[in-house]
C-alpha cells in the first residue's frame, strides 16, 4: 500500500500502479520454483536463503529514489526475484527442523508472518501522520535489515537432497511438468484453485489504497490502519486452520479459505464507512489463513520429500501468476467501476473454491 500511495504522490496513473503488481507477480511466478528447486539440490538451504535476501535488501532502498513508473518497475523486478527465495526455503527449513506436525509448523509460521504484517501496518499508520511516505519506507528498510541477523543465526539442518542436477531453466519448470506428482490426488486442482484465489485477491487489493482515499474519502493513515485488520485476522485463522486439519482433510480447509476470501472482496462493494471497510478486511484476512494452511498442508502431504521446497515454490509461483493477471484485470475494470472490480474478483475466488472442493481428492 505504501508503494501505491507513493506512486500516486508522483501522479503516476492507475494502470501503471496496478501494473506494478503484475510485474512483481510475473517475476515471482518464475523465481519461487527456481529458488525452491535450487535449495532442494543444495547442501545448505540457509546459504541460498542468506545470499538471496542480502541482494534483495541491497536493492530495496531503490523504491525511495524512484520517480517514474519505469523506475518502480525496475526495482520491483530485481527485488522480487531475490526476495522470492524466502517463502519456499523458510517453510522447508521450519518443517525439517521441527519435531512438531508439519501442519502445526506451517500454521505457526504463517501466524507469525501475519502478526508481523499486522503490527507493521499499525506502526505505519501514525508514522504517516508525522512523516512522508518516503521517510516511512526508509524506516521499514532499516527494520528489514535485522532479518540478516536472524537468518545468519539459523541452524543448518540436513535435508533429503534432490540428487539430479538441473539447469536453471529446468529448475523453473520442473515442478509444473511433473505430471505424475500433479495427478496424485489431483494436486493440480489445488494449484488451479490457488491461482484463481490469488487472481481475485490480487485484483481486489491492487488499487485498494486509491479506492479508499479517492472514492470512500479516507485519510492515508486510516487506510493503512484498517488494512492491519486483514493481517491480524489471519493470526487466529492460522490456528483455526491447524485445528480444522486435524478434523477434516486439508483440501476442505483450503476451499473454505478461498470461499471466505471471495466473500471478503464482495463486502467491499457496500463498504462506505470505517466499520464496513474493517469488516471486509477482516473477512478477507480470515479467508487467507485457512486457505494458505490448507493449501500448503495438501502440497506437503502429496509431494516427494526431496522435492518439498520445489513444490512449495510452485504453490507460491501459481499464486504470483494469479496476481499477475488480477491487477491487470482490475486496472481495466476500474475504468468502468470499482464495484465491478470487487464483484468480478469475489466471483473468481468463489469459483476457485468450487474447483478445489470438487476435484482435489481426500
What are these regions (language model features)?
Residues 1-25, 188-193, 198-219:
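Helix-loop boundary and gating motifs at the non-cytosolic
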Residues 70-85, 195, 276-290:
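Hydrophobic core of transmembrane alpha-helices in multi-pass small-molecule transporters
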Residues 47-61, 252-266:
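Structural signature of the two symmetry-related core transmembrane helices
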